[in-house]
Amino acid sequence: YITDELTDYTLQWLNDERDSKKPFFIYLSHKAVHANFDPAKRHRGQYSDAEIKMPDSLADTPENYKGKPMWVKNQRNSWHGVDFPYHSELNVKEYKRQYNRALSAVDDSLGRITAWLKANNLEENTAVILMGDNGFMFGEHGLIDKRNAYEESMRVPLIAHIPGAKQNYVVDEMAANIDIAPTILDIAGIKEQPPQFAGDSLLPLAK
């Protein structure tokens, strides 16, 4: 399973190829949480009894589409819409369950890596940042997938463990993916940012 395999590669590098005398940087990008969602065998059937509540904005009513562009309603019966998703008879609720099942392996991956950091006394000397590269829609506004400017499509999780920073703390200020590289350099003590970087370090918000 690709999520497990990528995690294995990461741990193999940490164990066998990392120079323990130098700082290290790892970028691990999981793929199985991209459509079509294919969970690991151990997670198949997970959440089968879980209730999936569809969003109120899915409703095909005049009130729901009041003030919205015509293309939003028109896309209901399209590749991006809940009435003909991916030009198929896809069950959007089951699709969401499949997504959650695939995501469970990412939870396992993060657990294995953080356990390695703890076992090697690096937990409090290593920053860990978990984020997505896009949102996803499961019926919101009558749509599926991504590729539009609704918040469900644009917003992504951003969770960070940074030694010395506040714990269990939520930042309300706007942050964007262009801020991640400057933040990593700041954590590493590199204050001079390359001129092509358009973002700002988020580290001051966590202190």
Put a short name on every predicted segment.
Residues 196-207:
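Short, intrinsically disordered, charge-balanced linker/junction segments flanking boundaries
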Residues 1-5, 11-22, 27-177, 187-196:
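Active-site-proximal cap/lid insertion segments
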Residues 180:
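Catalytic core of tubulin tyrosine ligase-like
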